Swiss-Prot record:
A Pfam family it matches: Aconitase
Family the UniProt entry places it in: Belongs to the aconitase/IPM isomerase family. LeuC type 1 subfamily.
Protein name (Swiss-Prot/TrEMBL): 3-isopropylmalate dehydratase large subunit
Lineage: Bacteria, Pseudomonadati, Pseudomonadota, Betaproteobacteria, Burkholderiales
HAMAP family named in the record: LeuC_type1
Annotated organism of origin: Burkholderia mallei (strain ATCC 23344)
Amino acid sequence: MAQTLYDKLWNSHVVHTEEDGTALLYIDRQLLHEVTSPQAFEGLKLAQRPVWRISANLAVSDHNVPTTDRSHGIADPVSKLQVDTLDANCDAYGITQFKMNDVRQGIVHIIGPEQGATLPGMTIVCGDSHTSTHGAFGALAHGIGTSEVEHVLATQTLLQKKSKNMLVKVEGQLPRGCTAKDIVLAIIGQIGTAGGTGYAIEFGGSTIRALTMEGRMTVCNMAIEAGARAGMVAVDDTTVEYLKGRPFVPTGAEWDQAVEYWKTFRSDEGAQFDRVVELDAAQIVPQVTWGTSPEMVTSIDGRVPDPEREKDPVKRDAMERALAYMALAPNTPIEAIKVDKIFIGSCTNARIEDIRAAAYVVKKLNRRVAPNVRLAMVVPGSGLVKAQAEREGLDKVFTEAGFEWREPGCSMCLAMNADRLEPGERCASTSNRNFEGRQGQGGRTHLVSPAMAAAAAIEGHFVDIRRLG
């Protein structure tokens, strides 16, 4: 019987299935960070349980680490306690960890693939909703809660119910100026933030196949914003080429065996999906969110929508509340929206490809950050991304134009560290969530691609980067 990619991943990891369909899944890799792991380790200690498979875990601090000078440590006592606790727990249990001043430190969903700890055919979990990122490698990856983190540490298994299968098929050539971020925002705009609820999404089609691994990770990263717990892309030569030579990847004869196995992780011809969504890549234009949910998105050449034109009273009410929070008037051209801060970073868009795309725009415009922009910051996703960008001279491109070049971490994606918006500040952000208060109490977030964020920094408002050539 023909199987989908998700079917293959699921079936190859089922240990036991109950009569109600609940399955015990074996977990190949658990990624840990400082926010959702302390209680899990405490539970192990209280029960006097060991970590079942130490080598299956990889840890890093990312949410609370400062992105400015780290020579004096972490100023905030709560953040410091969380980071110190992860350090102590990993030392106690012998878990591999990249500590704050290790060059390999970075955002957990960037360092996993970067190190080759994310591999095709794996089940991967982390106490973080954007674990779906790793599905770009033909893996089944999703976020879990703190009690589940403890369960995986203790048993290397997880109780789950199988999702339905959805295929999101994007065909055609992506227009100039459009990126993977625009693809996934367009998908969410079409199906809504509940469109993928109850499904595991496979992203396919010629447009997805043409993306780099960085681009595929961006798309899978935001599967959760489409309502799905997991997103994934079939394994191909692009996947294999990215992984070759990375630290955690098999070598020699084992590499050849692994590649042969990995390439089986694709949907079979004739495999049945419960839902299929199709997009024409040629119709995608640079996207900008205007509201307080990722589904509240439109094109750069569009206008802020008018709630009066929405017939559904529930949707109309949500639009009105979003516009009030965002301090936007209906029918305002998107290009007329001015910004106060720029954030280029996050597990969605802080890889070397993203940094290069933003730097290209800055060089092309050949001007400094606009006077009305109070802060424009670039936060690489890992120490290795930062080092690569500096070897290419990209840090100088940014700093000479008035951007701040920071240390790696989650940074302004969420108001959990020193990088945050003040009440009323408007930010062009390459992150994944634009909820009320996400980047700071009263902060207003517009989700865009790295190129769009860089252009907004220079112009002081959103602009259509397709005009840059």
